Curated annotation (Swiss-Prot):
InterPro entries: CtBP, CTBP_dehydrogenase, D-isomer_2_OHA_DH_cat_dom, D-isomer_DH_CS, D-isomer_DH_NAD-bd, NAD(P)-bd_dom_sf
Modified residues (Phosphoserine): 428
Binding locations of NAD(+): 106, 186-191, 210, 243-249, 270-272, 296, 321-324
Main location: nucleus
Organism: Homo sapiens
Feature: compositional bias, Basic and acidic residues: 434-445
Function of the molecule: Corepressor targeting diverse transcription regulators. Functions in brown adipose tissue (BAT) differentiation.
Name of this protein: C-terminal-binding protein 2
GO biological process: negative regulation of cell population proliferation; negative regulation of DNA-templated transcription; negative regulation of transcription by RNA polymerase II; positive regulation of retinoic acid receptor signaling pathway; positive regulation of transcription by RNA polymerase II; regulation of transcription by RNA polymerase II; viral genome replication; white fat cell differentiation
Amino acid sequence: MALVDKHKVKRQRLDRICEGIRPQIMNGPLHPRPLVALLDGRDCTVEMPILKDLATVAFCDAQSTQEIHEKVLNEAVGAMMYHTITLTREDLEKFKALRVIVRIGSGYDNVDIKAAGELGIAVCNIPSAAVEETADSTICHILNLYRRNTWLYQALREGTRVQSVEQIREVASGAARIRGETLGLIGFGRTGQAVAVRAKAFGFSVIFYDPYLQDGIERSLGVQRVYTLQDLLYQSDCVSLHCNLNEHNHHLINDFTIKQMRQGAFLVNAARGGLVDEKALAQALKEGRIRGAALDVHESEPFSFAQGPLKDAPNLICTPHTAWYSEQASLEMREAAATEIRRAITGRIPESLRNCVNKEFFVTSAPWSVIDQQAIHPELNGATYRYPPGIVGVAPGGLPAAMEGIIPGGIPVTHNLPTVAHPSQAPSPNQPTKHGDNREHPNEQ
């Protein structure tokens, strides 16, 4: 009995010595792990196998920034996100330890990349995973406008009788031949070029406008380049948008530019909703200045025909921001996003990152090893950090864990690692923004 008591005393003495060196670990390995959070999704089964040996992967399933859990705000050093939420400077300042954000998709207009860079947060995207899907969807929309398959289907569903030549002429009114038509592409990046290759096979003459692209690409693809937006709008029978959204091209298609288009031209947008002034488009459709439009993206998402200026617009096809999607593309995007996070953990930020889009705004550069690791985590891969506080789950494939004490409170940590603080207001480098760099003319989403 005395031997047992002696052992207990010795154990208590060791516990007092170790107290403050590292927190109590409820399960998993004893080494520190950075927290990486999927902000607006709930499935991290693809990401976990890539990151589980380096980081703890959790998900928030937030539908707005207000739903991001306090634990993630305080402790996450890496974040992955889709297009559901928007991170402004005010939102980014709430993150205490964040160093890298990876947008699972090509567009990054839902993140303030300048503010992120000034706060020492790298922002990355996945520019190439859904190029084929977006190009295929764009061609589908263009063919639909020219051949009117959607409206013909609707007519049959409504019971319209179509038999005589006169009835066919009436129900298919507006259908047009494609060969010899001019397709104008605004933006000629990966997706724009993929659309051009496909469109030529259908007989389109393809022209494009892209002020950021170097000369010569038009010769390799057998297309024509124009050097002003006005020239493209004037020459095109169908205009398709393939550029990212930024502060310079918001409402690029507006009442003024619509009046520069050919009478009865078509408009397709599978890039970003903010590129098109929907009020001006609705008016142009009603007046017949635009013969038809197909939109996969909208100014306000999720889109509803019941609301907004397009609810009464004729000759309009809308899809719910799905042009980017296929199972293969989704899987490739998620794998690429997790791999980019892995590069950040094992290398330097932003130098080691493959697709960092805000390097010109970045004010700090350091290896991951000097990140302020305020959270030393047990291996709780798949944990859910979301509101209301106290709700905890494990994603499919996650390891079962003792959750008590993890949600909602944090784990106190004492360490000797140097602190990396986010400057409250750091000046932007005296370096012009290159809007053509690191951009993909559209999207996933």
